[in-house]
Protein backbone atom coordinates (compact mmCIF):
# COMPACT_ATOMS: atom_id res chain seq x y z
CA UNK A 1 0.00 0.00 0.00
CA UNK A 2 1.32 3.41 -0.92
CA UNK A 3 -0.74 6.51 -0.28
CA UNK A 4 -0.95 9.23 -2.90
CA UNK A 5 1.45 11.45 -0.93
CA UNK A 6 4.09 8.66 -0.79
CA UNK A 7 4.38 8.92 2.98
CA UNK A 8 6.06 6.03 4.79
CA UNK A 9 3.75 3.73 6.72
CA UNK A 10 6.26 3.34 9.55
CA UNK A 11 9.11 5.29 11.10
CA UNK A 12 12.55 3.81 10.63
CA UNK A 13 13.07 0.85 12.98
CA UNK A 14 9.46 0.94 14.19
CA UNK A 15 6.46 -1.34 13.78
CA UNK A 16 4.03 1.31 15.06
CA UNK A 17 1.59 2.36 12.34
CA UNK A 18 1.49 6.04 11.48
CA UNK A 19 -1.93 7.54 12.36
CA UNK A 20 -2.83 8.15 8.70
CA UNK A 21 -1.98 4.51 7.97
CA UNK A 22 -4.52 3.37 10.54
CA UNK A 23 -7.16 5.35 8.63
CA UNK A 24 -6.04 3.88 5.30
CA UNK A 25 -6.08 0.32 6.67
CA UNK A 26 -9.57 0.80 8.08
CA UNK A 27 -10.79 1.96 4.66
CA UNK A 28 -9.05 -0.87 2.83
CA UNK A 29 -10.32 -3.37 5.40
CA UNK A 30 -13.90 -2.17 4.93
CA UNK A 31 -13.58 -2.51 1.16
CA UNK A 32 -12.21 -6.06 1.50
CA UNK A 33 -15.06 -7.26 3.72
CA UNK A 34 -17.25 -7.90 0.68
CA UNK A 35 -14.54 -9.86 -1.14
CA UNK A 36 -14.82 -13.64 -0.70
CA UNK A 37 -11.13 -14.32 -1.24
CA UNK A 38 -8.59 -14.74 1.55
CA UNK A 39 -5.96 -12.10 2.24
CA UNK A 40 -2.17 -12.36 2.47
CA UNK A 41 -0.35 -9.63 4.35
CA UNK A 42 3.40 -8.96 3.92
CA UNK A 43 5.51 -6.54 5.95
CA UNK A 44 8.57 -4.84 4.41
CA UNK A 45 11.56 -2.78 5.53
CA UNK A 46 14.04 -0.54 3.82
CA UNK A 47 17.62 -1.78 3.51
CA UNK A 48 18.86 0.12 6.60
CA UNK A 49 20.47 -2.46 8.87
CA UNK A 50 18.74 -2.85 12.19
CA UNK A 51 21.33 -2.06 14.86
CA UNK A 52 21.48 -5.03 17.21
CA UNK A 53 25.12 -6.14 17.22
CA UNK A 54 24.32 -8.86 14.67
CA UNK A 55 22.14 -10.88 17.06
CA UNK A 56 18.45 -11.30 17.60
CA UNK A 57 16.06 -8.67 16.29
CA UNK A 58 16.61 -7.80 12.63
CA UNK A 59 14.72 -6.44 9.63
CA UNK A 60 13.11 -9.90 9.36
CA UNK A 61 11.49 -9.58 12.77
CA UNK A 62 10.70 -5.90 12.20
CA UNK A 63 8.90 -6.65 8.93
CA UNK A 64 6.93 -9.48 10.59
CA UNK A 65 5.97 -7.10 13.43
CA UNK A 66 4.81 -4.54 10.86
CA UNK A 67 2.66 -7.16 9.14
CA UNK A 68 1.15 -8.19 12.49
CA UNK A 69 0.51 -4.58 13.55
CA UNK A 70 -1.37 -4.11 10.28
CA UNK A 71 -3.27 -7.37 10.83
CA UNK A 72 -4.34 -6.20 14.29
CA UNK A 73 -5.57 -2.92 12.81
CA UNK A 74 -7.58 -4.70 10.11
CA UNK A 75 -9.11 -7.09 12.66
CA UNK A 76 -9.96 -4.25 15.06
CA UNK A 77 -11.72 -2.53 12.15
CA UNK A 78 -13.97 -5.58 11.69
CA UNK A 79 -12.11 -7.93 9.36
CA UNK A 80 -12.62 -11.54 10.48
CA UNK A 81 -9.32 -13.04 11.59
CA UNK A 82 -9.96 -16.16 9.49
CA UNK A 83 -10.01 -14.01 6.33
CA UNK A 84 -6.27 -13.49 6.78
CA UNK A 85 -4.58 -16.64 5.55
CA UNK A 86 -0.95 -15.54 5.75
CA UNK A 87 0.96 -12.82 7.63
CA UNK A 88 4.67 -12.73 6.87
CA UNK A 89 7.76 -10.53 7.13
CA UNK A 90 9.80 -10.01 3.97
CA UNK A 91 12.55 -7.72 5.38
CA UNK A 92 14.09 -5.81 2.43
CA UNK A 93 13.82 -8.69 -0.05
CA UNK A 94 11.16 -6.97 -2.21
CA UNK A 95 11.91 -3.26 -2.26
CA UNK A 96 9.30 -0.92 -3.69
CA UNK A 97 12.15 1.36 -4.80
CA UNK A 98 15.08 -0.96 -5.59
CA UNK A 99 17.13 1.95 -6.97
CA UNK A 100 16.76 3.71 -3.62
CA UNK A 101 16.95 0.92 -1.00
CA UNK A 102 16.95 3.36 1.94
CA UNK A 103 13.80 5.16 0.76
CA UNK A 104 11.11 5.50 3.44
CA UNK A 105 8.52 4.23 0.94
CA UNK A 106 10.13 0.79 1.23
CA UNK A 107 8.82 0.67 4.84
CA UNK A 108 5.40 -0.63 3.97
CA UNK A 109 3.00 -3.55 3.89
CA UNK A 110 1.51 -5.40 0.94
CA UNK A 111 -2.04 -6.71 1.00
CA UNK A 112 -2.71 -9.42 -1.57
CA UNK A 113 -6.17 -10.68 -2.41
CA UNK A 114 -5.50 -14.31 -3.23
CA UNK A 115 -7.06 -16.21 -6.09
CA UNK A 116 -8.83 -19.45 -5.17
CA UNK A 117 -6.01 -21.40 -6.84
CA UNK A 118 -3.31 -19.61 -4.84
CA UNK A 119 -5.29 -20.11 -1.65
CA UNK A 120 -5.65 -23.85 -2.33
CA UNK A 121 -1.92 -24.18 -3.06
CA UNK A 122 -1.05 -22.35 0.14
CA UNK A 123 -3.52 -24.10 2.41
CA UNK A 124 -3.71 -27.56 0.93
CA UNK A 125 -0.39 -27.97 -0.73
CA UNK A 126 -0.21 -28.45 -4.44
CA UNK A 127 -1.35 -31.89 -5.50
CA UNK A 128 1.13 -33.75 -7.66
CA UNK A 129 0.07 -36.75 -9.72
CA UNK A 130 2.03 -39.87 -8.83
CA UNK A 131 2.51 -42.66 -11.34
CA UNK A 132 1.46 -45.81 -9.48
CA UNK A 133 1.52 -48.13 -12.47
CA UNK A 134 5.21 -48.04 -13.30
CA UNK A 135 7.32 -50.57 -11.42
CA UNK A 136 10.09 -49.05 -9.33
CA UNK A 137 13.61 -49.97 -10.41
CA UNK A 138 14.96 -53.17 -8.92
CA UNK A 139 17.73 -52.50 -6.43
CA UNK A 140 21.07 -53.96 -7.38
CA UNK A 141 24.24 -54.62 -5.48
CA UNK A 142 27.42 -53.27 -7.01
CA UNK A 143 30.70 -55.12 -6.52
CA UNK A 144 33.12 -53.38 -4.13
CA UNK A 145 35.65 -51.02 -5.69
CA UNK A 146 39.26 -52.16 -5.60
CA UNK A 147 41.39 -50.40 -2.99
CA UNK A 148 43.71 -47.68 -4.25
CA UNK A 149 47.44 -48.24 -3.64
Locate each region found by the language model.
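Proteins with a high burden of low-complexity, intrinsically disordered sequence enriched in S/T/G/P/A and R
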Residues: 1-3, 137-138
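Periplasmic OmpA-like peptidoglycan-binding domain that tethers envelope proteins to the cell wall
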Residues: 11-19, 44-124, 135-149
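Mid-length scaffold segments of soluble, non-membrane domains
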Residues: 3, 14-34, 38-41
Amino acid sequence: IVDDQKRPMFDSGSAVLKPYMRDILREVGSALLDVENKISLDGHTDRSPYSNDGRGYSNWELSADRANASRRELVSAGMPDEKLVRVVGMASSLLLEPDNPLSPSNRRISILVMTKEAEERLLGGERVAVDTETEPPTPSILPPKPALR
